[in-house]
Amino acid sequence: MEQLSCKHRSSSMEAEAQLCRQTESRSTQLPRMSVMRHLFLLSITFLVYTLDSAKAYRPTETLCGGELVDTLQFVCGDRGFYFSTNNGRSNRRSNRGIVEECCFRSCDLELLETYCAKPSKNERDVSTAPATAIPPMNKQDLYHKHHHTKSSKYDIWQRKSIHRLRRGVPAIVRARQYRLLMQKAEESEQALLHRPLTTLPITRPLHLQQTSEPSHN
């Protein structure tokens, strides 16, 4: 009987020891998990802070000389552009030209679009005016008019813009090109989705043509 009681006591002691070990292991795991969570949150906040600081202090893009002219020509297109006046800015910056702002400060797409020329009223009235209001011009008049026009230095830069564009397109223009390509891709996908499932035949079937011929005869 004494041996059985001793064995029972020893088994109960072992069970208590195992319970103590389990509780100790759980108590040590909880602070470890909390420390890992704190480290993870700190790393995320540090990454967000570094990304924001990089965006805030990143170097601004500048354009000068031929690259500025090529970019203006690409952005404005057929409208043309001017260098001195700027209708979209405040009076403080109205005296500055596009060269001073884009070459020495910073240049973005919105600033370039403000220097695009607007179509004049005369060009708009030509499309609505009747044909009799415009007198016909002879070939000699056209030749003399073309001969007397003077080309400025900006026109010469525009003619030579193809050679300068080979050096690379600025990031502002690349972003606009990518946006236009994405719009074209979306339009093509919508056209494919809205395509009709069935198309009606243009010509009549053969049996209808054969039946219509003897009726005419």
Curated annotation (Swiss-Prot):
Stretches for region A: 97-117
Keyword 4Fe-4S found: no
A Pfam family of this chain: Insulin
Cystine crosslinks: 64-103, 76-116, 102-107
Gene3D superfamilies from the UniProt entry: Insulin-like
Propeptide intervals in chain numbering: 124-217
Cellular component, GO annotation: extracellular space
Signal peptide span: 1-56
D: annotated segments: 118-123
General function of this protein: The insulin-like growth factors, isolated from plasma, are structurally and functionally related to insulin but have a much higher growth-promoting activity. Promotes anterior neural development. Acts as a ligand for integrin which is required for IGF2 signaling.
Protein name per the record: Insulin-like growth factor 2.L
Organism: Xenopus laevis (African clawed frog)
